[in-house]
Amino acid sequence: MSRGIIIIGSGFAARQLVKNIRKQDAHVPLTLIAADSMDEYNKPDLSHVISQSQRADDLTRQLAGEFAEQFNLRLFPHTWVTDIDADAHVVKSQDKQWQYDKLVLTTGATAFVPPIAGRELMLTLNSQQEYRACETPLRDAQRVLIVGGGLIGSELAMDFCRAGKTVTLMDNAASLLASLMPPEVSSRLQHHLTDMGVHLLLKSQLQKLEKTEAGIRATLVSQHSIEVDAVIAATGLRPETALARRAGVAVNRGVCVDSYLQTSHPDIYAIGDCAEINGQVLPFLQPIQLSAMYLAKNLLGGNAPLKLPAMLVKVKTPELPLHLAGETQRRDLSWQITAESDGMIAKGMSGEGQLRAFVVSEDRMKEAFALLKTLSV
């Protein structure tokens, strides 16, 4: 009798995989094990919960039981997997164990919290569960410090500002979105946030946090300090690799997989935020959707290597939305920027005159798909 497929995790990657498997096979045994409730929510909505006055429970789209019934699944919510015996094909928790034919890790990524004095005072917003734990202090806070000026930090800064809060956005870099694009491209968003009232502390590093009678004192390496009511860490995500490591599976920044989404162990696979695909960590929705589609075929006997096209990344800053694609982080590109009142087009050109990256904003985003077709990948 088939022991079937076990998926560890219940987020977007796990659900996309379940849907793709069930499109092809209605009966293969599917078991999901996860530490959370397994209720479905849309993670990108976390960037807008404060301005939209949403509580954590408002984000729920589908209850776990409904998901199990719809797709013929065995679910084990609120269950911590402690070990994987890869040779015996067994997954273990504290009081249960399950046998599998194929195992998929969709363990996601955890928010990185800088290792500073007072780090326990930092809040993170990387899941519905985390938001539920801190929604009251966040909603009550009037002065908010966001540490990290990348995608999530910029999105949260705009959202909290739209909610009428006093927002300070801090980053070590000299510009926002510094790991994604050069300052001449990100400056439009940077200026807009400043115009909204966001206070930017760039080229600044947090040294410590201290609880005070008035709230929290944040002290920088420069010894400048500010008083706030809440501090949010938006300093990036770290793929969750501990379980894979204990199973003897190769890990680097993420769980290492090849083009077939297969790890160093032939019957263990990984997709989503935890996976490092041929050396790349791609924590965005479109590569996860495509990974799930290809992996479903391979788990059911196929042999289809993942092929990723040029893809758009969306910055969810509604007052100045951005789409970007290609190698926007490359420092050797020559940028051609056209900025007008209705938006911006920035094209990153190689020395050979090829379009290798672009960023578009506002009304110029309608040109993104045409640019995507001409992008050299």
Swiss-Prot record:
It is an enzyme of class 1 (oxidoreductase). InterPro entries: FAD-bd_OxRdtase, FAD/NAD-bd_sf, FAD/NAD-binding_dom, NO_rdtase_NorW, Rbx-bd. It catalyses: 2 reduced [nitric oxide reductase rubredoxin domain] + NAD(+) + H(+) = 2 oxidized [nitric oxide reductase rubredoxin domain] + NADH. Keywords: Cytoplasm, FAD, Flavoprotein, NAD, Oxidoreductase. Its main location: cytoplasm. Its EC number is 1.18.1.-. Its cofactor is FAD. Signal peptide: none annotated. One of its GO terms (cellular component) is cytoplasm. Pfam families: Pyr_redox_2, Rbx_binding. It is found in: Cytoplasm. The keyword Flavoprotein applies. Pathway: Nitrogen metabolism; nitric oxide reduction. Belongs to the FAD-dependent oxidoreductase family. One of at least two accessory proteins for anaerobic nitric oxide (NO) reductase. Reduces the rubredoxin moiety of NO reductase. This is Nitric oxide reductase FlRd-NAD(+) reductase. It comes from Salmonella typhi. The gene is norW.
